[in-house]
């Protein structure tokens, strides 16, 4: 595609402003089962999103080919689409920032590693899982995945941006059985080099995780101090992250409406959106509208400081975009998305948090976030599993319990914040947090 040709042709056709969003994604997936490659797929998708303002309305056209022969067709589609728009929303194509930040991305040596070596790494992990404990009855899956994504934004207002993003990861799932009890657990890890992953240590941690779940039982219902482990806390924060979206606040479907500048959480809680995080999965110098990204506090020492905006929500609230306008794919509309959003970690070890509890519950897994959570009120009632703590020690696993409360209230009643920040696969992370009291329903 001769982009300069397209930009000039759009102007000549009477399109007031014109943008080319070009995305190319290549994905590789290797699945191992019982020592053999059970699946090996390589897929590549090239997509181009064209936007143009014609008679004050935004028209769009999507292409899967970058052939210049499609130019006349695409421009006509944009005009027709714009003429069908009845919305009175003001259309905008961004004019660009004065400068854009540098994002440091760790070099990914896995991309050039021969497939045979990636498969051998999976085989080594699978064998370590099988050899660890006789209670490991099945290695359900051992997978390697990698994603290579390139994107470029060019428009008639002088914006010419481009970047690349790479990610490689391992995922595994195992089954453990002891007597009549069977449990399943999984784990994953981003890797940039073979040296980033020790197969034996990875397998030991996953096996310990699943074996610890065996023979869990409910606890007596009541209010307990509850330690939400970092992964469970990240899942909960992910499900509620929409409360920080500017459009949700503007529409009144966020509990944070009219709370800017107010203390909403414990003063030890600070929540950051950091698109410049080195080697962060969601790191980016600019969003999908061409707006420069920057590090910002959503909550600082308990005070609600700012929300996340794309160009549309910023205009609705008479402010500027925070560089959080992203697409789910090249053919998706621009939405609001966080970029490496996390709760800053504290200074208490996981072991010390456990040791501080006379009697309490550790929650390691929560499920039912789609049904047991009200994203507006932040009330939650979630199926959970974890461990019972007595006298500062883990005494047994627990399952078939429900943890319930209100997120906003819980975040005002915190006993300790861990030093174990972990980013989730969604790009949202949290340390483990010990809450003063949450309702547990068991037996």
Short names for language-model regions:
Residues 1-291, 300-303, 391-393, 429-443:
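Active-site bordering "gate/hinge" segments
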Residues 259-443:
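Dual-mode signal for accessory low-complexity, basic/Gly-rich regions
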